[in-house]
Amino acid sequence: KVEGDRLICGAGVRLKRVSETARKAGLSGLEFFEGIPGCVGGALRMNAGAMKSWAFEPLIHLTTMDRQGLIHKWNAEDVEARYRQCPLLKEHIALEAVFEGTPEDPKQIKQAMDDYSQRRRQSQPIASSAGCMFKNPTEISAGKLIEELGLKGAHVGDAMISEVHANFI
């Protein structure tokens, strides 16, 4: 649901739908979700990211449920989010997220989304995959490290390290 410059999403909403809804509403800042498979809840749990943007960057409010079934409302700045993790969401389950966008011409947003898609097609495998598998160490990306080890194209049975991007299997 769009309210002004905010997009209110249930945890089960697909990320592609989030980016498309934001685009149609003229809200920039959520374009990077377009190519990430999965839903809002999972993206927040792992602080999913792409194109140098992260799930917690446009987030302003989060509603969760704890193990006792109690509902909690959080301001995003009160929730710790790190590279590929959100410690709170190990103990709580995300129910709803409120993202804030920046007003922008939907055509400009569409162009940014198209640019992201093009970059993905050039740098990531197009065929079905399990996605990016490993967290990046601090000094070098996991894909670069795997590539430098000469493992691009290596396989066990039908599982193969992508020849396009070594962090994809």
Protein language model regions, located:
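Generic structural motif
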Residues: 1-2, 59-62, 159-161
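Short, conserved aromatic-histidine micro-motifs
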Residues: 4-6, 10, 14-16, 60-77
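Gly/Ser/Thr-rich helix-start
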Residues: 13, 36-43, 50, 132, ...
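Acidic/polar active-site rim loop that often engages polyanionic ligands
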Residues: 2-4, 44, 92-96
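Anion-binding (especially nucleotide phosphate/pyrophosphate-binding) glycine-rich loop
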Residues: 1-40
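Phosphate/pyrophosphate- and phosphate-bearing ligand-binding catalytic cores of soluble enzymes
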Residues: 65-169
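Short, well-ordered, mixed-charge alpha-helical segments that flank or form enzyme active sites
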Residues: 16-19, 39-47, 52-54, 71-74, ...
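A gly/ser-rich beta-alpha-beta helix-loop segment of oxidoreductase catalytic cores
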Residues: 25-60, 66
